[in-house]
Structure formats: C-alpha cells, structure tokens
C-alpha cells in the first residue's frame, strides 16, 4: 500500500450548478420578478464572476464574503466564488456594518461582494476591515467566462457559516465540498426528495444554511426552478406562489404562521396549490402544522439540522412514517443517537425513549470552527457531534426534539422544557406566536414566563392566559408571568431570539 501513488480525488460544490447546465441547459433555474434565467445562463454568469475573481487575485481556498438578499446575483456570485476555488462567507443582510466587519475579519476574507440594497453596511464593514468591495450587479459582467470550475478536494472548505452566537460571539462553521454536495444530493433524491419539475419558492434567506442547502443546492441538484423572493412578505408570497405555479415551499415556523395569517386577512387571494412543504430551522408547533395542512391541503414534512450539520440530518419521510411533532428519521448516510447530557467530556448513550442530548455522525458533520480548536473539541467527541439539543429517540429511530439545553428552565428543582409549554399555548385561539423563557425568581430560582403575540383582533389578558394554562399543564409548568407584545425579536433566519427576551425581562427593561 505504501508504494501506491497518491491520487487526488476532486469534488466541487460548483458542480451542483455546472452539471444541470450541461445536461438540461434550457431548463429554467431562477425566477425573480420578470427575470428568468436558464441553467446555462446562470452558469455562464457564475463563470464570468469566477473569471473576474481570479483576475483580481482570488486563489483556491481564499475566503470571499457575500452580502446580499435573495436576488439572482446572489446565486451567480455564490457559484462564481465556488467556481473560482474560493470559500463563500455569507453575511446576514440584517447585520450592521460593525457586525459584518467582525465576520469578515474572523474569516480572514480577502474580498467583499455586496448588493446595492445593503451598500451602507458593506461600505462601513469595508472601511473597518480594508477589504476591496465589489457590486454584484455589475461585477464581472464583461469578463470572459472560465471554461469550467477550479477543482477542489472533497474535504476542502466550501462555505463558512457563522452561527447565531447564542453563547457569545458567532463562530464560523466550516462546511466542506463533500458536506454540501452530499447534503444537497440526499435532500434531493432521498427522504421525500425534490421531484422533477418542482417549482420552489425561494423565501428562506440564502445567506442561511437552510436556504442554501435545502432550497438552492438541493433544488439545483434535481434541476428545479427556484422562484426568489428578496425579502419575505407573506401576502406577496401568496401572490408569487399563485402567479408562478409554485409546487414546493421550504420555510421556518415563523413563515408558516405568517402565511396562515395572510390567508385569513386576504380572502381575495386564492390559496396556492402546493404539493409539498418542508419546515426546519426551529420547532414547528403541532397546532400550526395542523392549521397549515388543513388550509393549504398539503403535508408539511418537518426536519431537523444545524449549521454544523450541513444542515439536514433528519426528516419526516413517507416511507418511514410521518408523525406530527417529530422530526422524523435520520437521512441517508447519517447516524443519530442520544447521549447522557450529564456526561459532557465523552459519549455515553442512553436507552431508547429516554431524554438526552442529540448526537450526530456521518457525512453531514462539519470540519470544525474556523480558527477555534477549543470550541471544536467541545462539540466533536468520539466521532460524534454534540448538538446541544435535548431529544428522545424511539425504538424505530424516530426523533423528537424536546428543547435546546440552553433553553431548559429549572423551576424549584423541576426541569421544564419551554417547547412543551409553547405547544400548549399555541392551542389557545387568541395566540398567534409565543416564546417561553425562564426568568430569575427569588423563591424558585427560575420562573416560567410566556411572551405572547396575540392573533389578529384578539384581546388577551395575562391572568386569563395563566388560568387557561393551569388547566392544561402541570403545576410546575404553567407560566406565572405573561407579557402581551406586538412582535417577538427575530434573528436573520427568522428564529425567535430568546436570549434577547431573557435579557429584557430578567433586567426588567
């Protein structure tokens, strides 16, 4: 074996666009308003961008930051960076200049590509970091396209996704070409798949791993059409879905809640005829799932994943059985298990049916955090990735997510899982959205608090909510404090920012 020559295996995420452009060049890849691009046209634009990046000195492995909403130029820039051999560093569009600068500095990015809609943040970030900037609406438009993409190896970094920073400053999760090509392939062809002829709504932010991997890459892997919505608006989404004949939507729970509200508020707009819906990014309340399925006459297949797992690792799959309230079974080539959360330094499994920390291994697990070996060692143990989520796995392998370990509330010595309380409160007819948190309490250590956004036209009373909850939840679980608010704080991917609520209500602000 030692005498065998080393043969390099090549793989690039850019092939997710290059291959359909070669096989079905005239198929429609992207729609944005009146614009329509075929796969061949999209790939040509990406290769022009790649050629300009190479001319501007980008070398294989160089990080290139990308700050843009869901527009066609995001997609062509994304695959252009990959085609040049670069590593994409997506920057959330909701960040301010200083926040964007931190990500650019941390990733050691050599260039910043931006859309004019976020020029102010880009200009400030560039001023603080010194990186050259490029307007993606004009960059490379006159360049001679590269013939093909620069080859990379499977374990080379492809994208660095920054986590939401729930435990401090954001960390850059390194996803390799193998991670993301496999995740796109498994999402497109296994589980429930992406059927040929799919027209998908691109409403998930493409700077987020869910939008990139499940909407964009998985869709392109099966030559789907992606209809881009630059910024999510529920009423506009209904109109787009009807106009373009959208058959599939991937969304986070907040979006499903807003779509239901938009249907109720706009009876003049027909309910779109969807064939499939996918939910991820956060736990979907069963009450919302049931209402959406009844209203839109389609199933929601809820799945589970994280930035560090590329992201998809489980899904409710028809051939394995769909169950509301669960996130289904592991996807092809991925192992899921439950570990003892009280043993943080190594992996100890717990029996089926017992609560513990969800752990993952397989092709989806990331390569580590960029320039942060200590944080990497904390989560990668004995070939497993520790997710930080509490779950239960039954004998068949079906997984239920109970909550984040960091969201657990300990009231008077009893563990209370906020998701269980939220599921109960979402059954109240006057509740549109709810976040349950723990706040400091002198007697019990922590007290249960529900922060509620009422349904349109509902007049909620905190005492009434407490009394209603008391009849449906154990004495240690029902909220003793209720706040009625106009909206919940949302992060760039539209997840509820519970850390902000804890800070606000723990300090009495």
Q: What is each model feature region?
A:
Residues 10, 25-26, 144-162, 168-169, ...:
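Conserved pre-ATP/AMP-binding loop-to-beta segment of ANL
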Residues 337-359, 395-396, 458-462, 497:
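Conserved beta-loop-beta connector loops within the AMP-binding
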Residues 95, 112-114, 249, 362, ...:
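AMP-binding/adenylate-forming catalytic core of the ANL superfamily
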Residues 55-56, 83-152, 456-458:
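Structural core segment of the AMP-binding/adenylate-forming
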Residues 181-199, 207-248, 262-263:
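Conserved AMP-binding/adenylation subdomain of ANL enzymes
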Residues 7-10, 18, 26-71, 75-79, ...:
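Conserved AMP-binding/adenylate-forming core of the ANL superfamily
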Residues 238, 243-251, 261-322, 335:
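Gly/Ser/Thr-rich phosphate-binding loop
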Residues 329-333, 344-378, 416:
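Conserved ATP/PPi-binding loop(s) of AMP-dependent carboxylate-activating enzymes
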């Amino acid at each position: 074996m030692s005498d065998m020559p080393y043969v390099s295996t090549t793989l690039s995420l850019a092939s997710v666009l290059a291959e359909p452009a070669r096989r079905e060049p005239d198929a429609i890849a992207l729609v944005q308003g009146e614009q329509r691009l075929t796969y061949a046209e999209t790939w040509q634009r990406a290769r022009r961008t790649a050629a300009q990046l190479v001319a501007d000195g980008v070398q294989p492995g160089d990080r290139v930051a990308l700050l843009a909403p869901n527009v066609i130029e995001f997609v062509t820039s994304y695959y252009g960076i990959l085609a040049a051999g670069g590593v994409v560093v997506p920057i959330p569009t909701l960040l301010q200049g200083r926040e964007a600068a931190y990500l650019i500095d941390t990733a050691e990015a050599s260039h910043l590509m931006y859309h004019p809609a976020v020029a102010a943040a880009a200009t400030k970030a560039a001023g603080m970091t010194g990186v050259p900037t490029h307007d993606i609406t004009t960059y490379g438009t006159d360049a001679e396209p590269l013939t093909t993409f620069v080859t990379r190896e499977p374990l080379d970094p492809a994208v660095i996704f920054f986590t939401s920073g729930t435990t401090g400053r954001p960390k850059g999760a390194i996803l390799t070409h193998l991670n993301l090509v496999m995740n796109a392939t498994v999402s497109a062809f296994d589980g429930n798949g992406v059927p040929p002829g799919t027209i998908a709504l691109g409403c998930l932010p493409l700077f987020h791993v869910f939008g990139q991997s499940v909407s964009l890459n998985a869709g392109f892997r099966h030559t789907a059409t992606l209809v881009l919505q630059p910024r999510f608006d529920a009423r506009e989404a209904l109109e787009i879905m009807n106009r373009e004949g959208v058959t599939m939507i991937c969304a986070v729970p907040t979006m499903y809640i807003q779509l239901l509200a938009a249907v109720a508020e706009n009876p003049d707009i027909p309910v779109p005829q969807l064939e499939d819906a996918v939910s991820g990014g956060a736990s979907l309340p069963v009450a919302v799932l049931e209402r959406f399925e009844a209203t839109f006459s389609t199933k929601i297949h809820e799945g589970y994943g994280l930035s560090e797992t590329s992201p998809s690792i489980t899904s409710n799959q028809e051939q394995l059985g769909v169950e509301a309230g669960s996130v289904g079974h592991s996807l092809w080539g991925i192992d899921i298990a439950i570990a003892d959360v009280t043993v943080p330094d190594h992996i100890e499994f717990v029996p089926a049916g017992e609560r513990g920390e969800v752990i993952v291994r397989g092709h989806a697990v990331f390569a580590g955090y960029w320039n942060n070996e200590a944080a990497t060692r904390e989560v990668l143990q004995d070939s497993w990735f520790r997710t930080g989520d509490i779950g239960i796995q039954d004998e068949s392998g079906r997984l239920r997510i109970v909550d984040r370990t960091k969201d657990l509330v300990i009231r008077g010595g009893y563990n209370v899982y906020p998701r269980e309380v939220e599921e109960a409160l979402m059954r109240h007819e006057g509740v549109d959205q709810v976040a349950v948190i723990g706040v400091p309490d002198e007697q019990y250590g922590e007290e249960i608090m529900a922060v509620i956004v009422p349904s349109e036209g509902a007049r909620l009373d905190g005492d009434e909510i407490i009394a209603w909850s008391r009849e449906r939840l154990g004495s240690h679980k029902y909220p003793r404090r209720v706040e009625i608010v106009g909206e919940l704080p949302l992060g760039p991917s539209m997840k509820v920012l519970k850390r902000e609520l804890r800070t606000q209500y723990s300090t009495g602000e």
